[in-house]
């Protein structure tokens, strides 16, 4: 019974996986994204951003179908695996400030910009 109490106490302190493996990757990414229906739309928007015709945030507000568009596409911080694949993998592979090529998911086509990592 005391082992159960210890386990429950530890579970409330940290997730079981974090307790078992203290070297677990806890890196979080803060990313913004633009969600559109088609790959050609995403390619066109990315070109506008890269050419300096529009900022990523303004493009998100103008084009994105996601409710995050009102915040410039900001999704906040998230851990690996918390977002749909391959979105999550691409976000974690990008460097801060980098904008992805179009990424297809079941929701549509995304442009991802990593804002911060911690």
Which residues fall in each region the model found?
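Second-shell loop/turn segments in exported
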Residues: 30-34, 43-50, 74-77, 98
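Proteostasis/folding factors centered on peptidyl-prolyl cis-trans isomerases
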Residues: 3-35, 86-118
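Peptidyl-prolyl cis-trans isomerase
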Residues: 50-85
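A generic structured-segment signal
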Residues: 44-48, 58, 89-90
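Short, flexible coil/turn micro-motifs enriched in small/turn-prone residues
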Residues: 47, 67-71, 92, 103
């Amino acid at each position: 019974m005391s082992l159960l109490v210890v386990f429950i106490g530890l579970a409330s302190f940290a997730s079981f996986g974090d307790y078992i493996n203290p070297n677990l990757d806890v890196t979080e990414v803060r990313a913004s994204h633009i969600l559109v229906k088609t790959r050609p739309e995403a390619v066109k928007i990315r070109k506008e951003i890269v050419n300096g015709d529009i900022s990523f945030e303004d493009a998100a507000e103008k084009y994105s179908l996601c409710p995050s568009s009102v915040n410039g596409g900001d999704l906040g911080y998230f851990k690996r695996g918390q977002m749909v694949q391959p979105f999550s993998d691409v976000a974690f592979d990008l460097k801060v400030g980098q904008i992805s090529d179009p990424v297809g998911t079941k929701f549509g086509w995304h442009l991802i910009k990593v804002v911060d990592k911690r």
